[in-house]
């Protein structure tokens, strides 16, 4: 039985590799992606944000209601962004359900993501995003453990170790870049599954501002 199961597993694995070899890898040329201004930085690159927020922004772009792109930010040290760069950050969302009593599958190539940046291996590029004039929104889903104040976090770290630390330093750099211009402020859209996520994130940022002496 074990030999048979191993043989079947091997056959499945081989078939999967053959299928992957035959599949066309998406890229910006194949998806027909248009160049749009960067309006969103998104902390977190998981399925929920890509299948929900980024998907809706893609539709808004198509309808001419947003005209903006997203840069994904990897806020944690482990893992990599290879699978995103392999496809130029283009991917497919598949919706399956019933329409008027009939089963229906809708596949959509999402083109709203322009790039993906690693805060640890691409720190300068990450901080450079704060200098983008068209930037307007910050979306985050760093899990329920992401929004936390840590008084051992350091401004001098590149990057700071916590998500609020990374965000605070990012916002401070933007503040300095645009010399305090209030019109260059950013709208925060945290979707972490904790009560009062926006209030808690603001509290962490304000505590870090005080800890690091960034206020007036």
Label each region the model flagged.
Residues 19-216:
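Non-transmembrane, aqueous-exposed alpha-helical and coiled segments at domain scale
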């Amino acid at each position: 039985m074990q030999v048979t199961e191993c043989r079947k597993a091997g056959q499945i694995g081989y078939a999967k590799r053959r299928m992957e070899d035959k599949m066309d890898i998406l890229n910006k040329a194949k998806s027909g992606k248009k160049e749009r201004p960067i309006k969103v930085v998104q902390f977190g690159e998981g399925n929920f944000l890509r299948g929900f927020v980024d998907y809706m922004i893609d539709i808004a772009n198509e309808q001419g209601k947003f005209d903006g792109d997203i840069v994904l930010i990897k806020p944690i040290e482990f893992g990599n962004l290879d699978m995103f760069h392999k496809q130029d950050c283009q991917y497919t969302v598949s919706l399956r359900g019933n329409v008027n009593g009939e089963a229906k599958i809708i596949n959509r190539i999402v083109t709203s993501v322009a790039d993906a940046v690693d805060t640890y291996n691409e720190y300068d590029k990450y901080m450079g995003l704060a200098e983008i004039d068209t930037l307007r929104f910050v979306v985050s889903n760093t899990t329920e453990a992401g929004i936390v104040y840590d008084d051992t976090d350091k401004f001098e770290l590149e990057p700071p170790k916590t998500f609020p630390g990374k965000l605070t330093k990012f916002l401070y750099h933007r503040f300095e870049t645009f010399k305090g211009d209030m019109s260059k402020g950013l709208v925060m859209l945290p979707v972490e599954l904790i009560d009062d996520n926006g209030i808690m994130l603001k509290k962490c940022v304000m505590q870090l501002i005080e800890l690091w002496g960034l206020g007036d």
